[in-house]
């Protein structure tokens, strides 16, 4: 009796193993399709209702978002992303989106864009592996439509940004050209495990180490850097990790990363909340919309 049971178990394990291999290869092929087939350029589908020539902003915040993150966008609009003046300096926030195959989501974003006038959109599928396209879209928008901005911050929808403290530090820093700061990553290596979210193949990036770059959760740069990165980007090998791609552009431009403050101010790994502590940080990751609204009170 033991032998038939063992044989049945062996057959089941073989079938299970074969299924795992099949679905793994399917996922990998899907990953490859999403990584490399979508458009890298194109016309803007949506542009924000703003004129930087008449009222040049001190700080433009570019927030990567997706169609389903309406709650996140609304929370940001009510908190740190609200257009206002800090220390006499004007701040403006815009949301970066791609396209979706959902007609309902497309219609909702169309209505949202008409209502708020703060969405930037191009014709590429809005998936994680197109984040470089999304970020470069925002940088292109600054280059073409808002080069008057003194500073630009690229960040994500699940972030707490202390725009008051950031403005204070930028004014103290007094660096208006070739400036780039954030959470510095100076000794990072490509992840070669195929099932990692951050997997990069040898064909996509053949080198064994990344150039210095800042965490994509939030980095800040002087307005002139937007045009420099945009202009050099066509000569830089494309990689789907947007923060690494921007780092490659900075390396080509010989722009060195700098610390914003002697103490840590960017927290891509999150941070336990306290009123006193959050008054002296710039960016904190993993913040849900309801939490953001509570923190802002």
Swiss-Prot record:
Reactions it catalyzes: a globoside Gb4Cer (d18:1(4E)) + UDP-alpha-D-galactose = a globoside GalGb4Cer (d18:1(4E)) + UDP + H(+)
Q: Which GO terms describe its biological process?
A: lipid metabolic process; protein O-linked glycosylation
- State its location(s): Golgi apparatus membrane
> What topology does the record note for this protein and the membrane?
Single-pass type II membrane protein
Q: GO CC: one term?
A: Golgi membrane
Pfam families recorded for this chain? Answer: Galactosyl_T
Annotated keywords: Glycoprotein, Glycosyltransferase, Golgi apparatus, Lipid metabolism, Membrane, Signal-anchor, Transferase, Transmembrane, Transmembrane helix
Asked if the Swiss-Prot or TrEMBL record annotates the protein with the keyword Glycoprotein, the reply is yes
List its EC numbers. 2.4.1.-
- TM ranges are 8-28
The residues exposed to the Cytoplasmic compartment are: 1-7
As one GO molecular function, the record gives: N-acetyl-beta-D-glucosaminide beta-(1,3)-galactosyltransferase activity
Pathway(s) served: Protein modification; protein glycosylation
Lumenal topological segments: 29-297
Q: Which residues are glycosylated?
A: 130, 174, 231
Q: What does this protein do?
A: Catalyzes the transfer of Gal to GlcNAc-based acceptors with a preference for the core3 O-linked glycan GlcNAc(beta1,3)GalNAc structure. Can use glycolipid LC3Cer as an efficient acceptor.
| Family affiliation | Belongs to the glycosyltransferase 31 family.
Mind telling me what this protein is named?
Beta-1,3-galactosyltransferase 5
